[in-house]
Regions:
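Right-handed parallel beta-helix/beta-spiral solenoid domain characteristic of secreted/periplasmic
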Residues: 26-39, 53, 73-119, 142
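Right-handed parallel beta-helix
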Residues: 77-79, 106-117, 129-142, 159-172, ...
């Protein structure tokens, strides 16, 4: 009797385990060029289960509608990003104004495909924790145009974000944008011919390193803006990037905050705190290599703090800068200073420490409500003892393993 009871118990345990076990992860392969290729692609994203991989074959999908993914722990993997050989999602004929791909689930891995010519954002993720953007190309192939989509890759309201080896060209706002998020790494990526190359906005704890931000209007922006659910951006490190020739005329639609970014801006820090800018290579940024400013626009947010605080600029290499300052009065200031302004420009609001052996120009506007036309540009020294260095951002090991 005892043996029979044990055998029955073992059988019940086996059945329970079988029922509780998740289905084995599978690969859903999708081919381009078939009559129903578009439907099969969206169907694969809908039917995918946690652990699955949606595998995109080489070829071009001519898409008229945006795609979406709302299943956790899914990989979307293509065959490459190059025209003629990779997996190309072409939205040139898109009917609506939405994004190309919208992700709203956790633990998603996007890798090795291209998204072209979306009417809205290229790839957007919202509330998608532990998301990885890897080896992607997002491009508006006709180059800078006001009618291009706003953002290339656009994670927002997320924790643990990795953007690695991504190429973005032609975004009318920011090529690589991370907003209202926490614990962020943007690395080994290229942003070119966007209004803002890379932008970290209203976010906490970010490392932006080993990127190339070239031929944008502004290379790398670190902003904090009012009237958003998450504000008080802080603890951002911008280091070991190449920030050069950011000379593209600003083509952002009027009314966007980035429409105010002067052509020729290298790194622009606005109203953030605890930001370190170090080890970067700057060259050929006509307005300034580094700008540090307060938020000088009308707002109705009583909790908003508009000043930059604890900004540290150190150990950077400065090439030519300040020879074509594109802000109001900039040309006159440059002429008065012999043809160029110093590589570092501070509006005089908040506080900053600049340890680089280059000139710093202050506009002497400590109150952000003071009109810009009351600026009194003066060379200044901003030496001092910086606060303790910010720590390196660590992402979950499971995220790093995906890109190894």
């Amino acid at each position: 009797m005892r043996f029979q009871r044990l055998r029955q118990a073992a059988t019940l345990c086996f059945v329970a385990a079988f029922v509780a076990a998740p289905a084995a992860a599978k690969t859903i392969s999708v081919k381009a060029g078939t009559p129903d290729a578009n439907e099969k692609l969206q169907e694969a994203l809908i039917l995918a289960e946690p652990g699955d991989t949606v595998e995109l074959g080489a070829g071009v999908w001519k898409l008229t509608d945006g795609l979406s993914l709302d299943v956790d722990n899914v990989t979307v993997r293509g065959a490459g990003t190059k025209d003629g050989a990779g997996s190309i999602l072409d939205f040139s004929g898109q009917q609506g104004a939405g994004e190309g791909l919208l992700v709203t689930s956790d633990d998603v891995f996007l890798t090795n495909f291209a998204v072209l010519n979306t009417k809205g954002d290229g790839i957007k993720s919202k509330g998608a924790n532990r998301i990885v953007y890897h080896q992607l190309r997002v491009e508006w192939t006709a180059g800078p145009k006001e009618t291009n989509g706003a953002y290339g890759v656009y994670p927002v309201e997320s924790s643990d974000v990795l953007i690695d080896s991504v190429y973005v060209r032609g975004a009318s706002d920011a090529g690589i944008y991370v907003g209202q998020s926490k614990n962020i790494v943007v690395r080994d990526s290229i942003a070119t011919e966007n209004v803002a190359g890379i932008e970290i906005e209203n976010s906490f704890d970010a490392d932006v390193h080993d990127n190339i931000a070239a031929k944008n209007t502004g290379g790398i922006l670190v902003f904090d803006l009012p009237s958003l659910p998450q504000q008080g951006g802080h603890n951002v490190r911008v280091f070991e990037n190449i920030v050069s020739d950011n000379s593209t005329p600003n083509f952002a639609p009027k009314g966007n905050i980035v429409a105010s970014v002067p052509t020729g801006t290298g790194v622009l820090v606005m109203a953030n705190r605890n930001v370190e800018v170090f080890g970067n290579v700057f060259d050929q940024n006509g307005t300034a290599n580094v700008m540090i400013v307060g938020y000088r626009y009308d707002h109705k947010d009583p909790n908003y703090q508009p000043l930059p605080k604890a900004i540290v600029v150190r150990g950077n290499q400065h090439g030519k800068a300040g020879y074509a300052p594109a802000f109001d009065g900039g040309a006159q200031i440059a002429a008065a200073m012999g043809g160029a302004i110093p590589p570092v420009l501070w509006d005089g609001a908040g506080d900053a420490i600049v340890l680089d052996e280059v000139g710093v120009l202050s506009l002497n506007l400590p109150d952000v409500k003071t009109p810009r036309d009351q600026a009194k540009p003066t060379p200044v020294t901003l030496k001092g003892t910086p606060p303790a260095a910010l720590p390196e951002i660590k992402l979950p090991a499971s995220m790093e393993a995906k890109v190894q």
